[in-house]
């Protein structure tokens, strides 16, 4: 009661409350400042990652001259046509009225191919005898392969941090179609007199090693090695080939500006539908025979373009 009446005590209580409030405000200020610094650091890291994984460091100046589509006038076999780039190529070839067949695995999801009315033959590319049978029973004149390991094939999907913590999960190379599967297809194509072979592969192989950003090169070193073996096997086969190497690709809309260049240091991202356009254009372009190209889109140099449109 005395303290309530004593003005000095009331004044002391007032300043004590003020001091507590100021302390809380200081704490809040520190938290907000820390969040601000964290946000700035996050933006810096994301921006740095995008720049490091961009194609801004080298600009090609020469490109394959564009040409109108020319039909091969024979039966076309596509491998890897159930999804991604392969499926986009299927759609483009159907639009051109081509006689098209897709080779699929027994476990493949063929729903989209069936809806499109695409003829299908079943074989596991890793089993040479099955591939040979498919080729010997059909008179294919042209082969397009987008065959490779999909994320579903991997024993475990990992990001960079998980790989660091748990150790990188590797897949048995003998169970990956990137080399063995493509080798079996190339050999069967050669044995049955195929006229033309289009191979969709990745930037980072052979002379394009330095074009791939270092982080991507490290993360995909296993598949790059296998794809490079497949490329070399195709070159040595004697088939009339065109090799098209890709950087990252997206499901975004076509920019209409993608081109093929023999400049092996060129790197960009690219829409799958643009890859399909480049592949079927190269099919009938004699200037592309027995050559290796990087797919390049000047509007898709930065990683974030993969997630736009």
Role assignments for model-derived ranges:
Residues 149-261:
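Glycine-/Pro-rich loop/turn segments that contact NAD(P) or position catalytic residues
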Residues 76-98:
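N-terminal Rossmann NAD(P)H-binding glycine-rich loop of SDR-like oxidoreductase domains
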Residues 45-62:
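Membrane-interface motif at the C-terminal end of an N-terminal transmembrane signal
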Residues 22-41:
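N-terminal Sec-pathway targeting helices
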Residues 70, 81, 249-309:
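Active-site-lining helix/loop region of Rossmann-like oxidoreductase modules
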Residues 76-77, 102-191, 284:
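NAD(P)H-binding glycine-rich loop region in Rossmannoid oxidoreductase-like domains
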Residues 127, 181, 230, 271-274:
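Conserved cofactor-binding/catalytic machinery of classical short-chain dehydrogenase/reductase
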């Amino acid at each position: 009661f005395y303290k309530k009446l004593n003005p000095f005590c009331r004044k002391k209580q007032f300043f004590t409350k003020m001091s507590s409030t100021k302390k809380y405000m200081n704490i809040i200020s520190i938290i907000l400042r820390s969040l601000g610094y964290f946000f700035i650091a996050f933006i810096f890291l994301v921006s740095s990652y995008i720049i490091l994984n961009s194609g801004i460091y080298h600009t090609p100046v020469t490109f394959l001259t564009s040409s109108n589509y020319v039909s091969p006038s024979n039966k076309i076999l596509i491998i890897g046509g159930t999804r991604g780039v392969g499926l986009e190529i299927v759609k483009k070839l159907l639009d051109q009225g081509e006689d098209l067949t897709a080779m699929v695995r027994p476990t493949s999801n063929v729903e989209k191919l069936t809806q499109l009315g695409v003829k299908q033959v079943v074989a596991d590319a890793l089993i040479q005898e099955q591939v040979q049978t498919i080729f010997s029973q059909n008179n294919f004149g042209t082969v397009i392969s987008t065959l490779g390991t999909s994320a579903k094939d991997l024993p475990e999907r990992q990001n960079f941090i998980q790989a660091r913590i748990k150790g990188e999960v590797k897949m048995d190379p003998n169970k990956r179609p990137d080399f063995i599967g493509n080798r079996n297809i190339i050999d069967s194509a050669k044995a049955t007199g195929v006229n033309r072979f289009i191979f969709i592969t990745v930037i980072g192989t052979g002379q394009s090693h330095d074009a791939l950003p270092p982080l991507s090169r490290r993360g995909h070193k296993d598949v790059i090695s296998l794809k490079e073996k497949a490329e070399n096997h195709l070159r040595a086969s004697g088939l009339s080939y065109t090799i098209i190497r890709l950087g990252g690709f997206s499901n975004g809309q076509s920019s209409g500006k993608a081109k093929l260049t023999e400049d092996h240091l060129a790197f960009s991202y690219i829409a799958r539908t643009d890859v399909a356009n480049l592949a079927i254009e190269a099919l009938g372009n004699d200037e592309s025979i027995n050559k290796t190209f990087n797919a390049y889109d000047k509007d898709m140099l930065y990683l974030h373009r993969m997630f736009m449109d």
